[in-house]
Regions:
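A short glycine-rich, Lys/Arg-flanked "PGG" loop and its adjoining helix->strand segment in the class I
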Residues: 296-312
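Class I S-adenosyl-L-methionine
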Residues: 333, 337, 344-381
Length: 381
């Protein structure tokens, strides 16, 4: 891209920047639909922000697309507000979370009954040979707990019960007693041996029963859970954006591409990913979050499809994580705006909202990568 064009677009970009609404900075943990809390997902969009975006840029009955769906936050908020949702993600973990939230059992009683049946079936399976389990996985669990966990995950996958699987993944590791692992962090799996030495806290390294913890997790999932219309209102595709076929016509796109070079989704979800697929390799990485050129190619592929399928007067909201340390000419928001200008001429930049991310919202408090987000609001004319 020519530097003059980039400079011009940057000047226009900053003319459109406004601060996000003040209430976006408030916590929503105690008020959001509790299905949002099935299992942690690094870099996820706050549900209160997704709720506002859905309400502002769509109307009931609209079809909302999120091609980088992550944990399904946008899609769940869409269904809660009477919209339809079309989502996709290349991550197997994202697929489980999306389908768990969008196709959850209709009631707590139904969910508990399914859990009891699945637990009963898993108990009938032969114990796995832990010698075949990688040492880095074994170090997180009491051997009996690990055997129970592997058998339960096996039945969930066999029966394609993603709701129970997501609840299970949500209690896989933490330092609290309601979780299955030895003391460890919740979002990213690291053992906390220094803070909780085995010789000083032997009770934290004992067998942890699965059933009671799973049922408690399910009850928490339904603590604030209005009835969600699920019949035919949501579709999820497990694929990359480049291979994705968008609906022929849709009303709104709201998405947050992965934070390029700022988060390592595979490494940070490695323990959950192992239970999803024991043959999973930690070294496997979606190139979209590694290489700037791959990121730009992927965004270009997406906006071409949006240009063709987004309805006239529809909105396209792209949320981009920025790195303060980067030079202005390399800010991802500027790349995205230029790509949209080149490949989606029908999309006009309406507004840019800027949100500075406080340390309390970071998965790693000492991390100096993504410091703010830009909400790029495009309108199809």
């Amino acid at each position: 891209m020519k530097s003059a064009k980039v400079k011009t677009n940057m000047q226009q970009f900053y003319k459109n920047v406004v601060s996000v609404p003040a209430h976006w900075k408030e916590s929503c943990v105690g008020t959001e639909c509790s299905l949002h809390q099935l299992s942690p997902y690094i870099g996820k969009l706050k549900s209160s922000i997704a709720r506002d975006l859905v309400a502002t840029y769509s109307k009931p009955g609209d079809l909302i697309v999120d091609p980088f769906s992550g944990s399904g936050t946008v899609a769940l908020e869409a269904l809660l507000q009477g919209r339809r949702a079309f989502t996709s993600d290349i991550s197997a973990y994202a697929k489980i979370l999306c389908e768990a939230k969008l196709k959850s059992p209709p009631s707590l009683e139904c969910a508990l009954e399914k859990a009891e049946n699945t637990l009963s079936q898993s108990n009938k399976l032969p114990d796995p040979d832990l010698r075949k389990v990688p040492a880095w996985v074994r170090q997180f669990f009491h051997p009996r707990t690990l055997k129970d966990a592997i058998k339960f995950a096996t039945v969930c996958k066999r029966d394609e019960n993603n709701f129970l699987f997501a609840c299970f993944l949500g209690i896989l590791h933490h330092q609290r007693p309601g979780f299955l692992s030895y003391p460890s962090s919740h979002l990213v799996p690291y053992l906390r041996k220094k803070k909780y030495p085995r010789d000083q806290f032997p009770e934290l390294y004992q067998y942890r029963e699965l059933r009671s913890r799973l049922l408690s997790k399910i009850r928490r999932a339904y603590a604030r859970c209005p009835k969600i219309p699920t019949n035919g209102n949501s579709v999820h595709k497990h694929c990359s954006v480049r291979s994705l076929n968008l609906p022929e016509s849709f009303d709104c796109l709201i998405t947050s591409p992965p934070y390029m070079n700022a988060l390592d989704y595979n490494r940070d979800n490695r323990l959950r990913l192992w239970f999803i697929n024991p043959n999973y390799s930690v070294t496997t990485e979606d190139k979209v979050i590694q290489k700037q050129e791959a990121f730009k190619i992927t965004i270009a592929s997406l906006v071409k499809k949006v240009n063709s399928s987004l309805k006239t007067n529809g909105y396209c909201v792209i949320i981009v994580g920025e790195r303060i340390a980067s030079k202005p000419k390399t800010h991802l928001s500027h790349f995205v705006c230029n790509i949209v200008a080149d490949y989606a001429p029908s999309l006009k930049l309406l507004e840019v909202m800027e949100d500075h991310i406080p340390d309390i919202r970071r998965s790693r408090r000492d991390y100096r990568g993504t410091k703010k987000e830009h909400f790029l609001i495009f309108h199809k004319v």
